Amino acid sequence: MFLGTHSPRLDEKGRLILPAKFRDELGNGLVFTRGQERCIYVFSQREFERVHEQMRDAPISSRQARDYIRVFLSGASDEMPDKQGRVTIPAALRAYAGLDRELAVIGAGSRAEIWGATAWAEYLEEKENAFSDTDDNDIPGIL
């Protein structure tokens, strides 16, 4: 499970050093893809295969499903971290998420997410008030 917030930096080659707590889960390969809110989703190979299986069950007659699958999978890139836990984030995904040197890598349960540090701080500031006001009627089954 991916938990917490980490603040690594991109090096000049577009590489990220994976947070130590995430390396066991991602050390045998990972998949980057476009995330919602202009972040990058990071899945273990196993979890990505599970997500892909769910997508395969979507009706091909659904335009919304086709559109989502195309955007999601066309941006996907499978990568292998090196022995130091570094992994290159493809340039197209760095551009999509507007990444510069300072990052926020957050745990989101079954996946990690990579955000630009400023974008993450802005998102968190915007959403924290709504978070504190959320009750069990707003999100059934979670609280």
From Swiss-Prot:
What GO CC terms are in its UniProt record? cytoplasm; nucleoid
Q: Name one GO biological process term.
A: negative regulation of DNA-templated transcription initiation
Keyword Chaperone (UniProt):
no
Pfam families in alphabetical order: MraZ
InterPro entries found in the cross-reference section = MraZ (IPR003444), MraZ_C (IPR035644), MraZ_dom (IPR020603), MraZ_N (IPR035642), MraZ_sf (IPR038619), SpoVT-AbrB_dom (IPR007159), SpoVT-AbrB_sf (IPR037914)
Domain SpoVT-AbrB: where? 5-47, 76-119
Q: How does this polypeptide assemble, per the annotation?
A: Forms oligomers.
Designated name of the protein: Transcriptional regulator MraZ
Question: Which organism encodes this protein?
Answer: Renibacterium salmoninarum (strain ATCC 33209 / DSM 20767 / JCM 11484 / NBRC 15589 / NCIMB 2235)
